[in-house]
Amino acid sequence: MAPFFDVVLLGDGELLLPAFIDALQELRGSPRRERLLRLAQLPGVYVPSLYAPRYDSDGQLIAIDPLTAEVPAQVAKQTWRGNTLSHSTVITPEAAWPSIHMVEVVRSCPELCRFCLASYLTLPFRTPSLDDGLIPAVEAGLGATRRLGLLGASVTQHPQFDELLQWLNQERFADTRISVSSVRAATVTHELASILARRGSKSITIAIE
């Protein structure tokens, strides 16, 4: 990986980015190797040039060894377990999904279908609470736009998704267009379809495709 990546962050940005950005600012102007060594000491930060792959006689990878004792032998993925997931911080008509406030409802998926990278790369399955996580995240963006996107590999499997739907069915959201990312076929209900239709959705993506 070293010819392509200087640094790889393993895990969730909520944990990785604050320390990573602070370290970059502290190291501004430092020699390249010093910067890479310092970054490699942060939890969840992998610097490929400071490690070497080791293979057996058949060419099978058996280990990835650190080239210096200053970096950890293994880099552990960092897993965010807070009560909030990500949501849009910049809302603009120039975005790929223009003028829409995105809110992450779930991270990963409990089904773990073998073909689905979204499930495995972001394990474990996590859900923020409705009152302290999702509702504040939704309201944070609706002052800037009346378009809301609910994101996740299987948003309808949030344990409080029905309550979220009822909350979004209030009259004060009558002018808000709501769309959802993929949902499992078994979780599509008449209530879900009706509320989404009333909020401007014309289609949904159903998994497994």
Can you say where each PLM-predicted feature lies in the sequence?
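Canonical Radical SAM [4Fe-4S] cluster-binding loop centered on the CxxxCxxC motif
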Residues: 95-130
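N-terminal [4Fe-4S]-dependent radical SAM core
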Residues: 48, 54-102
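Structured alpha-helical segments in the cores of large, soluble enzyme domains
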Residues: 17, 101-109, 133-141, 168
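Glycine-rich beta-alpha loop elements in corrinoid/cobalamin-binding modules
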Residues: 1-65
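Conserved structural-core and active-site-/substrate-pathway-adjacent residues in large, well-folded domains
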Residues: 6, 45, 108-109, 113, ...
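Conserved SAM/AdoMet-binding glycine-rich loop
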Residues: 134-209
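Ferredoxin-type iron-sulfur electron-transfer modules in oxidoreductases and energy-metabolism complexes
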Residues: 92-93, 126-138, 142
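Flexible loop/turn segments at secondary-structure boundaries
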Residues: 16-18, 53-55, 110-114, 122-125, ...
